[in-house]
């Protein structure tokens, strides 16, 4: 009996090693492109963005989920770094603070050129990986960080932003967040306001991916129905597996499928198991469910490392991605499906967003109605509190000019 137990144990170990080896072989040519990592936030909170401090050395930093050796061990070849500031910056210094976080990402690329290469388009991601670099891209987490300005949106694009999360844990004046669905916030726009729809259109024109993590279900549906390009959820999981309002319900997954969009699964325990503890296997359950409902082309990885506190057993840091891929292979995911999950689905969506951008040329020039803005910390040059009055004055001036011209002729 003992011999039989030993034999089956040995067989299980060999099978496990086989799946792990297969995972690593796949990842050597198709690396992880992760949708969301909050290391820049850690650089702020731990080191006040002083990257040259000896204790901030990313080759040795131990207290974060992410460092250079862990990225290498995890076969991470592309990373969307989150440029994030909390909601209490809204209507205050949000734009200044997000510029500082974007600067951190650029300085990471400058300080570690042998590891990080800042890129801004889909074709450069795999080229950077083939040069042995981690392609580094910028996602801005929270629509409050554009301060309801299309000009700021365009400027952040020129600084490298390639996705914008429409809300964080607060409404913007033009989009509702997920706390509305929980009953902890009031619906102000019932999804997207008219100005919010202009923001979406301008993102399509620029080639900025629309990120629907953190938004309300109504905002999800508005964006999926209105966007001319596929959208992403950069760090969200499946509501049917864990009914947390930050996750994506099945009816929205159907829209994800019909629009060729993408859900990049979050590893935070509360979104994985709806409790303080979770396992790698439960993360795989989310991936299985999204694949079943929306298709294998709709799944990606957005671990949310360094943005959360509790992570599943087996996925404690960014080095653990090969173990997750091995589990999916054990569950009979095909190599094609795995390569899609790792990188190819994201590259497809990113390329489609760029294609739409190439055919949209005219920028939006409307501004948000001034009454939608908190005016305590802002000026209003160029705005009008009563546009109808200005139109009447304009018409009057035109009439007077016509009258003066007529009198001159007399």
Curated annotation (Swiss-Prot):
Q: Where does Zn(2+) 1 bind?
A: 36, 38, 141
- Give the lipid-moiety residues, type GPI-anchor amidated serine: 384
Q: Which SUPFAM superfamilies match?
A: Metallo-dependent hydrolases (SSF51556)
Which residues are noted in the entry as Zn(2+) 2-binding? 141, 214, 235
Quote the subcellular location field of this record.
Apical cell membrane; Cell projection, Microvillus membrane
* Positions bound to substrate: 168, 246, 304
Q: What is its main location?
A: membrane
Give its E.C. classification number.
Answer: 3.4.13.19, 3.5.2.6
- So which residues are the signal peptide here? 1-16
Membrane-topology annotation of the record: Lipid-anchor; GPI-anchor
Positions annotated as glycosylated: 57, 121, 332
Catalyzed chemical reaction(s): an L-aminoacyl-L-amino acid + H2O = 2 an L-alpha-amino acid; leukotriene D4 + H2O = leukotriene E4 + glycine; L-cystine-bis-glycine + 2 H2O = L-cystine + 2 glycine; a beta-lactam + H2O = a substituted beta-amino acid
Listed GO biological process terms: antibiotic metabolic process; cellular response to calcium ion; cellular response to insulin stimulus; cellular response to nitric oxide; glutathione catabolic process; homocysteine metabolic process; inflammatory response; leukotriene D4 catabolic process
What the record says about activity regulation is: Inhibited by L-penicillamine. Beta-lactamase activity is inhibited by cilastatin.
| Propeptide positions | 385-410
Q: Its GO CC terms?
A: apical part of cell; apical plasma membrane; cell junction; endoplasmic reticulum membrane; extracellular space; microvillus membrane; nucleoplasm; plasma membrane
Classify the source by domain of life.
Eukaryota
Q: How would you classify this enzyme at the top EC level? A: hydrolase
Q: Which UniProt keywords apply?
A: Cell membrane, Cell projection, Dipeptidase, Disulfide bond, Glycoprotein, GPI-anchor, Hydrolase, Lipid metabolism, Lipoprotein, Membrane, Metal-binding, Metalloprotease, Protease, Signal, Zinc
What does the sequence similarity comment in the record state about its family?
Belongs to the metallo-dependent hydrolases superfamily. Peptidase M19 family.
Question: Subunit arrangement?
Answer: Homodimer; disulfide-linked.
Entry protein name: Dipeptidase 1
Q: Give the gene name.
A: Dpep1
């Amino acid at each position: 009996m003992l011999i039989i137990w030993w034999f089956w144990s040995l067989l299980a170990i060999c099978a496990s090693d086989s799946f792990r080896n297969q995972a690593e072989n796949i990842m050597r040519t198709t690396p992880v492109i992760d949708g969301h990592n909050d290391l820049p936030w850690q650089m702020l909170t731990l080191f006040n963005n002083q990257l040259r401090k000896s204790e901030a050395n990313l080759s040795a930093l131990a207290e974060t989920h992410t460092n250079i050796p862990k990225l290498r061990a995890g076969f991470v070849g592309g990373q969307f770094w989150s440029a994030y500031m909390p909601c209490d910056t809204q209507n205050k210094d949000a734009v200044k603070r997000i510029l500082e976080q974007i600067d951190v990402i650029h300085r990471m690329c400058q300080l570690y050129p042998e590891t990080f290469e800042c890129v801004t388009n889909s074709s450069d991601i795999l080229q950077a990986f083939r040069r042995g670099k981690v392609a580094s891209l910028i996602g801005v987490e929270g629509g409050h960080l554009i301060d309801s300005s299309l000009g700021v949106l365009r400027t952040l694009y020129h600084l490298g932003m390639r996705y914008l999360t429409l809300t964080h844990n607060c409404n913007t004046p033009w989009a509702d967040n997920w706390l509305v669905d929980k009953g902890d916030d009031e619906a102000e726009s019932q999804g997207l306001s008219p100005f919010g729809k202009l923001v979406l259109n301008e993102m399509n024109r620029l080639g900025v991916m629309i990120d629907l993590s953190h938004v309300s279900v109504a905002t999800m549906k508005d964006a999926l129905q209105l966007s001319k390009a596929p959208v992403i959820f950069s760090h969200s999981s499946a509501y049917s597996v864990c009914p947390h309002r930050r996750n994506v319900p099945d009816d929205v997954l159907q829209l994800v499928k019909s629009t060729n969009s993408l859900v990049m699964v979050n590893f935070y325990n509360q979104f994985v198991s709806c409790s303080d503890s979770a396992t790698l296997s439960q993360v795989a359950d989310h991936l299985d469910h999204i694949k079943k409902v929306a298709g294998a082309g709709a799944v990606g990885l957005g671990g949310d490392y360094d943005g959360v506190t509790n992570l599943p057993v087996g996925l404690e840091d960014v080095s653990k991605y090969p173990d997750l891929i091995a589990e999916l292979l054990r569950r009979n995911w095909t190599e094609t499906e795995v390569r899609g999950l790792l990188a190819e689905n994201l590259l497809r969506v990113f390329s489609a967003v760029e294609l739409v951008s190439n055919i949209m040329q005219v920028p939006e020039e409307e501004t948000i109605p001034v009454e939608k803005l908190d005016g305590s910390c802002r000026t209003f040059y160029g705005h009008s509190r009563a546009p109808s009055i200005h139109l009447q004055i304009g018409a009057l001036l035109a009439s007077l000019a016509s009258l003066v011209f007529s009198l001159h002729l007399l």
